[in-house]
Amino acid sequence: MYGISSFYCRDPPNLTCLTWIGIDLAVAASQTDRCLYEIIVPPSLGQVRVSRISDPIPSTIISMTALPPGNGSSASSSTSGPAVMANTASSYQITKGSGSSSTSASQATIVAGCANGTLIFIQADVLGLGCTSQRVSVRRQKSISVSSYVGGEDAIHPVTSLCMMQPRGSSLLVGLETGTVLLLTMMGGLYQFRQILKSNLNAPVHAINSIDRNRAAIAYGGSVTVINITKNNSTELSYKLQSDGDAITALANTGRVLVLGCEHRGAIVLDLLSGLEISVIPPPPYDAVVSVSSQPVASNGFIIATRRGVVIGCRENGTVRSCATLEYDSAHLPVSKIAADGAPATLLSPLADSSMTNVDENLGSSVGGIRDLAFAPYGGSFLCLCLNGLAVGYLAPQRLSSGYITIEVTGLTTVMITDARLQVSEVYTAPEPVISLFLSRFAHTLRLGATTASSVIVWTPPTMAKISSFSLEGGMPLVTKIQWITEPVRSTSYGDMIRPSTVQNQPSTQGLPNRQQQELDFDNLLEKPGDTLQQTESRPLLKSFSQKKLEHDKASNPPIKTAAYVRNPPRYIVLGDSYHLVVDISGEANIVSATTLALVTSIYISSLDSDRQIAIIDSALAYVEGGTTLRIIDPRSGNFILRGVIHHKAVLDLTIGISSQQHIRNASETSAKEGTQGNAVSDFALGSVFSNLTGHQAGKPVDATASTSSLKQTEMSSNDASSYVLALLDTSNSLYVGRLTTSPQAYAKLGNSMSTAILQQSKFLDSIPYSIQFIAQTDLLCMLISESQSLPQALSQIGETVGSDCKLRLVVDACPVRTSIITEDPVFVTPTTIDYSSVQRSNAAVSIFEEDPSRILAAYRMLSRSNIHTIHRITPMVLKNDGLMSNAITMSHAVLGLAGDSSQMVVAVPEFSVLLNYLAKSGNTQRALRLCRFLDQKPLWAQMATYCIEANNIQHLQSALSGLGMVAKASYCHSISSHNEVNAGAVKLAIGDPEGANILSSQGKIGAAILAACDLWNFSKALELCRGNKKYMPLLVYLRTKYHNNLGMSNCNNEEPWLSLSRQYGNVSEDEIHRLMKG
């Protein structure tokens, strides 16, 4: 966590009940003068503006709620599913500032709970971001008493907690000090409610938090309960503190955990799935927790505030990232006060002392402890309400790495990208504080992404193919470093400007070109019209940052590239090869072009828990809505491919890969047309490293076509059907996979079926998978699993070597979608085991203020149950055809995040499975066969067998089955290889795949299917085929009797059902038998 800027201000006094109603706009109540105040915090965090917006209210406000920005009622907020339309009527929109003080306005409904038991509904107009005057204007308000709902007109029921349920706020949860919880639903009008739920909890209700549109957590006394308002308010989770002297006073949640703020014990992190404690973060000595808040973005962190002004930043699994204090780590800045007409105001509160009006003289005074704290709606930045003023802070996202390239936030708005291959580090200035960092998980091309409050920035580092294309004379050319990413693509942001800041270059005797440092800089939104043309000097937000002078040109330069306009703050971005997906906080998902960020289409996703529930390739976009509903759309049009199937468990991880099936068939057809056997590869060449394996000489490609310098994948045709593989991991750690098609007609009749209609469960050695990920642009599925005795013994280990059961292995399944194929599993296990016990022990010391061994041990046990591990990205290998350099430019590697990204590491991926995949997809089966023969590994032979089945290559299938030791099946393949036309069903039956019989049956070749099954002595399968086609029973009885008689087994029909079948169908002429064989 970077430092904190505090704004000392005794006027207005005692601000509490912080509630955000805009991306830079919050509302708070003063307990001294009983007025409401608006607080404007621009994303730059350079200043804070405060203004009074209401008259004194008769009773003290002790709780307040409003819908977060982007969650209002709109056309795209329908719960019926995604709509192919842009969200044009959001309750709050990011609008560009105009020259006038009044811009487009929206409305907000604020609900306040008072100490006298009344609810105050305030309807307010909210002006756009460009105005310089007061932003919130109260239109009308109405008060109602909760006594009419609770009973007892004379009793007073202080409203201690409120929560407006998302997405449209039609439901309102009210918690009372007397222990009653009310669920009110809007009926027809703004102030007309119907009571749905009334429950007496027998303890004061301290906090209510909306987990999603259906679930809410209620804290009362020392207990917390999670209810589902759509399932008869059933209880899904319950938890109670062990000590009676403590209470849960604050709540926050991420996609997987629920954070409880306890005054004395500290912050308790509960797993939402199991209800178990996974971490406890105690407060400092003689201090107490007053508030907790979570980020609504992909980083999934949360912060804890204490009464004495300590702010603790944590990861999702409860491990401490950083800590700061208001007293020692904050920079003091003045607060700006404005009146309703925009003029500076010196006195806002009716009760303020005139001697306290000049806050600039008290700039060095302390703001005191913290009353309330909340993240901004876009995450990253947070606002604290203190005893004597306000404070803003910033929690930077964690560093990300692809193995060779690293992206990290080095300042409030500066991003550094480091390329370890070229030893290059570039620093870029973002328009606002950087909130989240992303890597392209599914794209073959590595892309880096960053989000701010209102913009998206995408970098595309140069590929190894581009780097290797430079001349090697005189070593690595300097032009490589100079031409490294100079123009990051970005979306429209606050100031809507890009100003190139010219860096002064020294004369070079080597004739190097002058380099222009591209710097993203934006106008301060709150500047008055006309200030844009002046030179300004930015104040440092934090003491640790050096001041930086920004040069403003007299004329604003337009954006260098066309970009989509982000209406609401982005929450997730998913980077692909041709398309990116930008999901904002309202649920609107914009599919944009990868080259320009220009908008392609927009859909609406009502509920999305994590960016691990989205997967995108060029032909399909899959996502999980509401945790259990899987939907697939075409990113090129926004139309449904699959409207929705229901999974029986919540989905944790979703990944998508491009199927090899279509590539192999296309390559096979191309080879057949050209009359060659696997030498039609034109998209890559192999170097001398693999010359002994594949029979290829370095620098002398044997292909007739020209070869390029890198091993890359064949591009997928846009009209390919059956072109992708989908895999998901649910909360029970069960893996489901399926090969799907891009044709919507294939799923038109599914409706709301179960996911098992398109996916099948996959198991491997009874190991528990923690995370799954396809290697980019392939169907090779990588799984991060726990170490077990059934796995091959590891040759090396990362981490400690003895006394640990916290070990992981990475495995690659080369054919994740398979039926009952009787072959060796094509699964490759990395020879390195990962021991993360040291990471767990480091995380277990969650207390940064005390040294209690028993406390640390307890925390370690809790963290051991978390097991939040992630595969961030898997980069496939790249080869170079050059005798002067190493051929393997980039080896296949995976980037893993252990224990909630507490530690990131790079692990090698088995190379030969990737190489065989590329060879097979390119139709280069001769080299693939040489590779298998040289290595002679059963998983590699099994992978080769699956590719031969897809290509209907019976000749090479015979070799693969021989390598697996399946002599009978190889002999059968040899017997049918002499046929002019080898049927795909016969090929599948050769290895015992029941799908082969289905293929032959669908083609009307029942006789051929029965003959193939009998040749493999699979008489039970042949009998199953005949039961649906009884006219072929004589053929089955004839073949079975003949095969047994040839072995001298004349009594083969003495048992049922063959005894009765031979009596009924045994006397048939041979002419009829031959006729049935041809059928």
Swiss-Prot record:
Stretch list, region Disordered: 495-514
Localisation: Cell projection, Cilium, Flagellum; Cytoplasm, Cytoskeleton, Flagellum axoneme; Cytoplasm, Cytoskeleton, Flagellum basal body
GO cellular component, one term: axoneme
Regions of compositional bias (Polar residues) in chain numbering: 501-514
Origin: domain of life: Eukaryota
Pfam families: TPR_IFT80_172 (PF23387)
Coiled coil (residue ranges): none
Keywords: Cell projection, Cilium, Cilium biogenesis/degradation, Cytoplasm, Cytoskeleton, Flagellum
Record has Cytoplasm as a keyword: yes
Record-level GO BP terms: cilium assembly; intraciliary transport involved in cilium assembly
PANTHER family noted in UniProt: OUTER SEGMENT 5
Entry function: Component of the intraflagellar transport complex B (IFT-B) involved in flagellar assembly.
Protein name: Intraflagellar transport protein 80
Source species: Giardia intestinalis (strain ATCC 50803 / WB clone C6)
